[in-house]
Amino acid sequence: MDDTKKPAPRNTGETLACLIIDDPLLKPTYGCLDYRKLLGEMKAHNFFTEIAFIPYNYRRSDPETVRLFADNADRLGICVHGCNHTSNEFGGGDYRRLRELAESALWRMEEHKKNTGLPYDPIMVFPQGKFSSTAMKALRDAGYLAAFNSKITATDRQTLPDNEYQQPATKIYHDFPLFLRRYPEDRADFVRDVQWGRPIVVVEHHAAFKNGFRAMTDLVDWINTLGNIRWTSLLNIAEYYLGEKAPDIRPKTRPSPERLRARLKIAVRRRLSEARDNYIETNDLMTRIYRLIRG
């Protein structure tokens, strides 16, 4: 085995790192996020960003933005973020339904790859951070390499042994690896990640960049002082810490269409979420009104 693919030794060697931004479409701008400006910051401060891409949007990517990703594969990548990104999408216990969602998401990502030429990482980032232990089995059986999430407690298991938090990834759910990602304010935990031989995985959303990238680049600069940090994709992180290569994605059959009512509900939800991101969260006054209304 290539030494670079072996699990990272604790307290020594490289620490791999990545910034994940949830939800954005591949458009020149999305909400407060401008991809070209982000790329400039990544080059100046030496970090990598992975977009948690919603498979529902597989036919909506902008060709110019796709080229930007393809031309800068050392700085930008995409992974799988749910399937339709509906509420508690992967939090239930129906294996058949969860397997259908997992397979449908991969089919859409394969179609996106076929239509745009842009590869993706067979990594799942759960919508709203919700997943069940059964969902982990469904992902494993569908051919994903790993999942990344902002917590490692499932909807049907709220406590885990302490040692599960001390590993690069937990495999407590059906022997399928789950990596923990963190928000920028969790600096003490990032230090512990380095000490325990875990990757540093930062999560944010587009609204974090309303006032520019300074807060994020300050965090990146600080992370880069913690040791031998190498920023890279989630695929590379998973392969490195698991000591195994991602399996080839088996051909997927086109998923059966949802019923009309379900399709309309999903479409409305996605458009409303995008309207919030693009027209409300980009404006301070509108954001305050929106939060007041939502309580």
Residue ranges and their predicted role:
Residues 48-136, 153-159:
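Metal-dependent polysaccharide deacetylase catalytic core of the NodB/CE4 family, i.e.
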Residues 14-16, 45-50, 74-77, 118-121, ...:
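Loop/turn elements at helix/coil->beta-strand transitions in domains of secreted/extracellular proteins
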Residues 31-41, 61-66, 95-108, 212-222:
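Well-ordered, non-membrane alpha-helical segments in soluble/globular domains
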Residues 2-75:
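Active-site beta->alpha N-cap acidic-glycine motif
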Residues 280-294:
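Conserved anion/nucleotide-ligand pocket segment
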Residues 41, 45, 68, 108, ...:
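Alpha-helical structural signal in soluble globular domains
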Residues 1-28, 137-269, 273-283:
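C-terminal active-site subregion of NodB/CE4 polysaccharide deacetylases
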Residues 33-37, 119, 130-134, 197, ...:
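Short, well-structured alpha-helical interface segments that form or flank functional binding sites
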